[in-house]
């Protein structure tokens, strides 16, 4: 069964919206996620017109693997990725309109690899292309290795992702089991 994940702006209150990630399976909405971390950085203030969400999306089941949802600026906050990994996520999906700017491409690639390593999850990141955004969609394996990538132009990228690879990496690099403490809300 095909799973489609997309982002839209959904009205919240008059003149405002949620930056919403929606997951569809067989034409039905199976998950909604209102972006937690609004992009109020690099001279942009998303919070002027967008309301922050307040819940982590439930994990999805896709082809026998558990998938966590994040979007864009959420990438800079490792707690969200970690919380989903601790719930059992094996893949983290992140659509993003990553705005161009000094060192932004470096931030994108570094943070994607870091989140894969922090969580020992695959990262599937769809980067919006265009004049303002960097594109650079990527699939990164749980060891932080890019296994598929696109440039700044629209492209279809594919890679094999398997639960066996997640188990193999987690056996070699058991960071989720080796954690000694965390704030209570992340347990």
From Swiss-Prot:
It comes from the Bacteria. Residues 1-163 form the CN hydrolase domain. Transmembrane segments: none annotated. It holds the Pfam family CN_hydrolase. Pseudogene resulting from a nucleotide deletion that introduces a premature stop codon at position 66. This is the C-terminal fragment. The intact protein (AC A0A140NCB4) hydrolyzes deaminated glutathione (dGSH, 2-oxoglutaramate) to alpha-ketoglutarate (alpha-KG) and cysteinylglycine, has less activity against alpha-ketoglutaramate (a-KGM) and no activity on glutathione or L-glutamine. May function as a metabolite repair enzyme. Belongs to the carbon-nitrogen hydrolase superfamily. NIT1/NIT2 family. This is Putative protein YbeM. It comes from Escherichia coli (strain K12). The lineage of its organism: Bacteria, Pseudomonadati, Pseudomonadota, Gammaproteobacteria, Enterobacterales. The gene is ybeM.
